[in-house]
Structure formats: C-alpha cells, structure tokens
UniProtKB/Swiss-Prot annotation:
This is 3-phosphoshikimate 1-carboxyvinyltransferase. The active site is at 313 (proton acceptor). GO terms for molecular function: 3-phosphoshikimate 1-carboxyvinyltransferase activity. It comes from the Bacteria. Monomer. HAMAP family: EPSP_synth. It is found in: Cytoplasm. Phosphoenolpyruvate binds at residues 20, 92, 120, 167, 344, 386. Catalyzes the transfer of the enolpyruvyl moiety of phosphoenolpyruvate (PEP) to the 5-hydroxyl of shikimate-3-phosphate (S3P) to produce enolpyruvyl shikimate-3-phosphate and inorganic phosphate.
Length: 426
C-alpha cells in the first residue's frame, strides 16, 4: 500500500524513467535487425520486460541490466517458433505490435496476457492483418486474447483506420515491411509516431503524407545504438504535482518531447501553467528537452478533438489538476479511455470523488469542477498504473493521509515513483 502525505512544496532536479513506447520498440526492432543493438535509458518496467521475455522465447539473445540492454539481432527471419505461448503480461503495446511481426513469420504462435489484456479489443489490429493474408484467430472471432497466429506471405494494403491508434498503425506497418508491395495506413487524426521515427533510425524508408504513412516491403533493419529519453507520460505526474502544490518548481531533465505526445504541455500552458523547454535537441530521430516547471494559478478549459490522442494517457492526472483550476474543465472525444487498463472514465470519477472532488462522467469524457479542497482517502488503483499515480498526486494536496491500494501496478511504467515523490516533496 502506498501512503501519501500532504506536501508543502515540490522542489528539485530529477529524471524520470525511460519512455515506455520507445523502450518497447527499441527491443523489438533490435531483435528484427541484423547485428547488435545497444539500448541505454531502457524502462525496466513490467510491460517492457514482457517484450524482452517474448523475444527470448523465440531464440533472441538479450542481456538486460537495469536500464542497459544489448540485443543480438538475427534479422527478420531469425526468430524461432516458440515452444510455449508468448505471455505479454499487462502490455497492450507488446501484443498488438507483436501481432504485426508474428503475421510475417513462417510458423505458429499463441499470444496471451493477464486479465486486463483479456478484456482489451484486438480486432482493430487483427482485421487489417487478416486482410493482408495472415491467419489469426482468438476468442469471439479474434476480438479477444488468446490470439493464435500463423503468419506467411502477406500482401500490402492501403488501410483506412477508423481510430487514431499508434498500436494499430504500427502493427500494420511492421507486417507491411515483409509484405509484397506498398502498405499504407491513413488515420482520422495523427497518433504517436515513435514507430516511424525509430524505423528510420534503424535504416528503413518511411513515407509520410498528411495523415497517411507508408512503407515498402522487403526492407531490412540494421542494429544500432539507441538512447531512450525520459517518458513524458511519467513526467506528466510531476508536472501536475508542481501545478497543484503552491510554491513549487522542478527541473525535469532529458524528457522526450515528440509532438505526437506533447498534448500535456499544450494543456498545462492553456490552463495558465508556466512550463519552459530548455536545451532542446534531437536524439535517434526523437526530440528531447529539459522541462522547467513552476507552480501557477490554473483555470479550467475544454479539451477535445485532435489533441486527445496526444494526451490520452495523461487524462487521469489532467483531471487531478482540473480540481485545482478556477472554473470548469470539460474533457470530450475521449471514448478510448474506456478500453485502457481499466475504463478510465469510470475509474477516474469513482476514485477522485473519494477525495471530495466534483467530477461527473459523460459518454466520451468527464466534467471537473474547480477549485475544490480535497480530503485524504483510501484509493484503489484497480491495477491501473496511471490511476494509482494520478491519485497519489491528488494525495499531495489532500488534507490528511491518502492510502493507495494495489499500488504495485505503478511499476509497469514508473519504477521508483514513490521514492522520487518523497525526495521532491517538502
């Protein structure tokens, strides 16, 4: 159980763990590349360790010590048929991107995960991969895990995705790299583009045209050194802590500021928050900066439309900030929250309400009333890492002690979260 006390101030200079999305892809692409890939700044959280485990079961040598990883790549067809099921744990990224890779392989594989993964929709990925020629089955005609995949010769497709999802786009692109001809994906809005950037870093040609990204089949990846920046989704919790605790300021070093992920920065600024980007630079095709965050009086805003895919994971902690903003904050167009580790609309509302916050669910988001005094509460993370951390930030401003049950879920993306919170809280 995580115990959080009310904080007087947040101060210091810190780094957050490596970016989860980039860490997954570095291991996957390193395994498929020819030659050695070294990774520094890897996130040694449960989800990324699941990705390592899956590739080890297919004969790839991977050495991991803390945030340093070495992958001995064997090329696209160097993977071996696993003798056991591939267990992705709690990782939606692992199962969806791996589905695209497995669709290209000349063998059979079964992928499964934990209870949360068993409830998450897979047909959005399976449908286009079937169109390309992969034989894939699962519960309810491939809607749910376990997934049985027999890969083979694939044909490139031009796919119009009904959702802006980096996982869907990435699975199709990865399958497309070994399909005949050109494969393209067009999205309704831009989603995260870590796959495109990292494929280019590994020597793959990727063509972008507006909302469409395309790759030609038959391309090879070349092993290389990768430096993973800090995860902006993890930094978001510390940014929020500074915004809600008066008199606070924090320098967060080496954070990835990929434009497809910086919705949180835009929202903080729109609410009146002070956040400066220092020492901006490019590392492995990814933009990186140090963030200087200073406490500010916030005001409520409306968050909707194209920005939602750029901050979907940050909505739980944005809701916490909104409780301390003057006026009302409205979040719309965020139906995707319902199919995360939990139904995050329902979970944010139920847990934040325990503090005495004024928060109302809607079909596609929530309405948060500010400015509200919070009282310490007993919170259940429901096994969702982002809910656990968001409620811990609420605990920093709540009167009395806050207890968070099922806090082990936090290790999925932010090992050492509680220790860091104690270090910067005064």
């Amino acid at each position: 159980m995580l115990r959080v006390q009310q904080a007087k101030q947040i101060k210091g200079t810190v780094r957050v763990p490596g970016d989860k999305s980039i860490s997954h892809r570095a291991v996957m692409f390193g395994a498929l590349a020819e030659g050695t890939t070294t990774i520094e700044g890897f996130l040694p959280g449960a989800d990324c360790l699941s990705t390592i485990s899956c590739f080890r079961r297919m004969g790839i040598e991977i050495e991991q010590q803390g945030d340093a990883v070495t992958v001995q790549g064997k090329g696209w067809y160097g993977l071996q048929e696993p003798s056991q099921h591939l267990d992705v744990g709690n990782s939606g990224t692992t199962i969806r991107l791996m589905a695209g890779i497995m669709a290209t392989q000349p063998f059979h594989v079964v992928m499964e995960g934990d209870e949360s993964i068993a409830k998450r929709p897979m047909r959005r990925v399976i449908g286009p991969l079937r169109q390309m020629g992969a034989k894939i089955d699962g519960r309810k005609d491939g809607e749910y895990t376990p997934l049985s995949i027999r890969g083979g010769k694939l044909q490139g497709i031009a796919y119009q995705s009904p959702v802006a999802s980096a996982q869907v786009k990435s699975a199709i692109m990865l399958a497309g790299l070994q399909a005949k001809g050109v494969t393209s994906v067009t999205e309704p809005h831009l989603s995260r583009d870590h796959t495109e950037r990292m494929l280019q870093a590994f020597g793959v040609q990727v063509v972008r045209d507006g909302l469409t990204v395309s790759v030609e089949g038959g391309q090879k990846l070349k092993g290389r050194a990768i430096s993973v920046p800090g995860d902006i989704s993890s930094a978001a919790f510390l940014i929020a802590a500074v915004m809600v605790v008066p008199g606070s300021s924090l320098l967060i070093e080496n954070v990835g500021i990929n434009p497809s992920r910086t919705g949180i920065i835009d929202v903080v600024k729109a609410m009146g928050g002070s956040l400066e980007l220092l020492n901006e630079r490019i590392v492995n095709e990814e933009p990186v900066a140090d963030l200087l965050v200073t406490h500010s009086e916030l005001h409520g805003i409306e968050i909707a439309g194209d920005i939602i895919p750029r901050l979907i994971d940050e909505i739980p902690v944005i809701a916490v900030m909104a409780t301390q903003a003057k006026g009302q904050t409205v979040i719309r167009d965020a139906e995707e929250l319902k199919v995360k580790e939990t139904d995050r609309i329902a979970t944010v509302v139920s847990q934040l309400s325990k503090f005495g916050a004024k928060v109302t669910p809607t079909d596609d988001g929530m309405i948060i009333g500010g400015k509200t005094g919070l009282t310490g509460a007993i919170i259940d993370s429901m096994g969702d890492h982002r809910i656990g951390m968001a409620m811990a930030i609420a605990g920093l401003i709540a009167e009395g002690e806050t207890k968070i049950e099922n806090d082990e879920a936090i290790d999925v993306s932010f090992p050492g979260f509680h220790d860091l919170l104690v270090k910067i809280s005064q």
